[in-house]
A protein has these predicted regions:
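Histidine-anchored nucleotide/phosphate-binding helix
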Residues: 45-63
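A Trp-anchored, charged/polar loop motif used as the substrate-binding/catalytic surface
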Residues: 16-21, 124-128
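Short glycine-rich or small-residue beta-strand-to-loop segments that form or flank ligand, phosphate
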Residues: 34-45, 68-72, 142-144
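Primarily the HKD phosphodiesterase
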Residues: 61-75
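An acidic, phosphate/nucleotide-engaging active-site surface
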Residues: 77-153
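N-terminal amphipathic/basic leader segments beginning at the initiator methionine
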Residues: 1-17
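Glycine-rich phosphate/diphosphate-binding loops that line cofactor/substrate pockets in enzymes
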Residues: 20-36, 61, 137-138
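Conserved active-site and cofactor/substrate-binding residues in soluble primary-metabolism enzymes
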Residues: 13, 17-20, 47, 51, ...
């Protein structure tokens, strides 16, 4: 479902363009009570996901209870990196993803499908895993901000 679209390869979105777009999309989602935002980590700084995350915090206020940068297997972000990427977003909202201990398995991607999409390069099932906060946090909205997509480790 598309909540809002704007821009093209010939148009650079300004801060105000981003804010207007984000607010239009969030307005359509309606009122929420407990929100988790999952932006990319510092390695994706140019994506402007930090700017968007700060706007999400400004929009939702205290209902944005957790921010879980999608570290994957990267090292946790430093305070300086968080400040640089996420501006004035409160530091107490940030959680660190521990990929060795904080993941739970939701299910399994069947070997047949893995083989099909990998064009025969991989022929075994793959666990579908997420950080346990997504399941145990009782969120009524989980926002994937920017270039966060599931992938293998």
């Amino acid at each position: 479902m598309i909540y809002y679209q704007n821009g093209s390869s010939q148009h650079n979105l300004s801060h105000e363009d981003l804010k207007k777009s984000l607010i239009a999309a969030l307005d359509k989602l309606g009122r929420k009570h407990k929100i988790l935002a999952i932006p990319p980590d510092y390695t994706r700084l140019p994506s402007r996901a930090g700017e968007l995350t700060e706007m999400v915090w400004e929009y939702y206020g205290n209902t944005l209870t957790d921010i879980l940068p999608a570290l994957g297997t990267h090292t946790p972000m430093t305070d300086e990196q968080i400040s640089h990427m996420f501006g004035k977003t409160p530091r107490n909202l940030f959680r660190v993803h521990d990929w060795r201990h904080d993941v739970i398995t939701l299910g399994e991607v069947p070997a047949e499908y893995v083989k099909e999409v990998s064009e025969g390069k991989v022929d075994f099932s793959w666990p579908a895993q997420v950080n346990k906060l997504l399941v145990e946090g009782n969120f009524d909205l989980i926002l994937s901000i920017g270039q966060v997509v599931p992938h293998e480790v």
